[in-house]
């Protein structure tokens, strides 16, 4: 495999380890000085790798599920990945009470890879759909 394929495989493994709840794998896959340009809106997260671990612990408890890699493109040290995240809103997420309902959202993430580790992240999530599924925004009414 070439560097681009290795980088894409690294990102796929990252999501597989998230799905498995393997927090220890983050030490291998993510640089200590990891920079998240779009961190989750959770107050009090530490910077870097430690903040990423904190966020995953919170989301694993509240919204267990899986990530499906739909598409990937790699160029130089960047990997763009489109994912579909499916799960269940199982436990309260901060002040948002759990609905116990299904979650199904898409996101696009771009990672920069350096020396076999994720070093930077930029992302866009379908936040509107996510907020509807979390019960924060009312879902649209069905046909009349």
Feature-to-residue mapping (PLM):
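C-terminal and inter-domain tail/linker signature
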Residues: 1-144
């Amino acid at each position: 495999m070439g560097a681009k394929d290795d980088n894409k495989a690294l990102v796929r493994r990252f999501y597989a380890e998230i799905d498995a709840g393997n927090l220890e794998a983050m030490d291998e896959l993510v640089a200590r000085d990891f920079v998240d340009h779009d961190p989750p809106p959770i107050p009090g997260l530490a910077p870097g790798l430690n903040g990423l671990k904190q966020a995953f612990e919170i989301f694993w408890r509240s919204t267990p599920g899986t990530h499906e890699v739909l598409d990937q493109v790699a160029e130089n040290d960047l990997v763009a990945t489109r994912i579909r995240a499916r799960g269940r809103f199982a436990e309260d997420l901060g002040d948002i009470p759990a609905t116990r309902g299904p979650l199904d959202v898409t996101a696009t993430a771009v990672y920069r890879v350096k020396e076999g580790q994720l070093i930077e992240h930029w992302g866009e999530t379908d936040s509107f759909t996510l907020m509807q599924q979390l019960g924060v925004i009312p879902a649209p009414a069905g046909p009349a």
